[in-house]
A protein has these predicted regions:
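A structural signal for small-residue-enriched, beta-sheet-centric alpha/beta enzyme cores
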Residues: 1-90, 94, 100-408
Length: 408
């Protein structure tokens, strides 16, 4: 049985968290800007990173630190990306060293992340000086996870925090996560930080496999604005304190773990898509009847990434032609004359296109459907049985305002 629970990254046994203001965000002393997540014991660890060729300094450091598949803690700051700036890797290593000193572990056992403005030298001194207070603030509580979630926010308007509980090998296993992401989010990961914790016992090899299988069908299926960031990191720590037999191969226990991990990451991905900068609507695009899953995914990603489709949803305009247009330039091979399109929400479900041709439909009802916060675009391709769901958001005037003065 899989259940959603409270606790975020502190839901699993043996994890503590904290988030405080140290001064990275010089313009907002009331905003937390450094987070720390610590396990009481060493963890199996894995991470996936941005596919952008331009990578932030912490990513290079993390790849080296995670080469052995182990970690003890995560330190992350907001307000500065530590990307394309002098002494980037040196400063990232200094953050790791400061955290390691407080915790009592090796710097190589620390994962480091940053998010914020690109191209400015990070003030690592205020982070180093703030780590003792950050460490002292560590707790295993809902409030501590909440503080860490707030400390990694940039243009986010709400925290992203989820936890789940399941059974693996007869033992209760918990996992939780916090994430940030509101702009520069696009399939294949984009300005998104996501930190996951679990007390499941699982080998480094299998947790890496599970993370890769999960990211592909969750975070890589969201889009806010089509920009892929320099800093994306999704990292998972597993400390084994649940007491289950260590998962070392695929089987029933692995399947149970994977199901929970996917549920956790799907919920976090949806929260990020819904909190797109200035967004008023969460758009869920489900493609069914595709020849294969790759085709379904290509089409769904194209639709949620379409600026014109986003604008239509913002205006509650049932311009289904923009959906077909986005499908057509997606690169997927399909027959447009087999395509059906519906719009749906809590207000109802209405067919607007059948076999590639427009239908007469109730404009007033459609307007009502598209005015709801959660809007679905349902596409049937009529060529097979494969399906895929992707998530995005509308684009509003506020998106321009937020990004027009981001550095201020």
């Amino acid at each position: 049985m899989l259940n959603f629970i409270e606790g975020g990254v502190c839901a699993a046994q043996g994890f503590r968290a904290a988030g405080i203001h140290v001064g990275v965000k010089t313009h907002a002393a009331w905003k937390k800007d450094v987070a720390l997540i610590v396990s009481d014991v060493d963890c199996a660890a894995a991470a996936v990173f941005t596919k952008n060729v331009v990578k932030a300094a912490p990513i290079h450091v993390d790849k080296a630190h995670l080469a052995d598949g182990k970690a003890r803690a995560i330190i992350a700051n907001s307000g500065n990306a530590n990307a394309c700036a002098p002494h980037g890797e040196e400063n990232a290593e200094k953050m790791c060293a400061a955290a390691a000193k407080a915790i009592g572990c090796k710097p190589e056992d620390i994962v480091v992340s940053s998010t914020g403005v690109i191209g400015q030298t990070i003030n690592v001194q205020v982070i180093e000086e703030g780590v003792p207070a950050l460490y002292a603030a560590l707790e295993r509580s809902n409030e501590a996870s909440d503080a860490a979630a707030h400390a990694i926010m940039t243009t986010d308007t709400v925290k992203k925090e989820v936890a789940v509980e399941t059974t693996v090998g007869g033992k209760t296993v918990r996992m939780g996560g916090i994430a940030k992401g509101s702009g520069m989010i696009h399939p294949n990961m984009g300005t998104m930080l996501c930190f996951l914790t679990t007390d499941c016992a699982i080998s480094p090899e299998m947790i890496k496999t599970a993370l890769l299988e999960t990211v592909g069908v969750t975070f890589n299926r969201i889009s806010v604005d089509g920009d892929t960031s320099t800093n994306d990191t999704c990292c998972v720590l597993a400390n084994g304190l649940a007491g289950n037999e260590t998962i070392t191969a695929k089987g029933p226990d692995y399947d149970a773990f994977l199901t929970a991990l996917r549920a956790l990451c799907t919920a976090l991905a949806q929260k990020m898509a819904a909190d797109g900068e200035g967004a008023k609507h969460l758009i869920t695009c489900t493609v069914s009847g595709a020849a294969d899953e790759a085709t379904a995914e290509t089409v769904a990603k194209s639709v949620i990434s379409s600026t014109l489709t986003k604008a239509a949803i913002f205006g509650a305009d049932a311009n289904w032609g923009r959906v077909l247009c986005a499908m057509g330039y997606s690169g997927a091979a399909f027959d447009p004359e087999k395509v059906d399109v519906h719009f749906a929400s809590a207000a109802g479900d209405i067919a607007v296109c059948a076999k590639g041709r427009g239908l007469d439909f109730d404009e007033a009802l459609t307007k009502k459907i598209l005015t709801e916060h959660d809007v679905e675009i349902l596409i049937t391709m009529g060529e097979g049985s494969a399906t895929c769901t992707c998530w995005g958001c509308d684009i509003t005037y506020d998106y321009i305002k937020i990004n027009g003065d981001y550095r201020t």
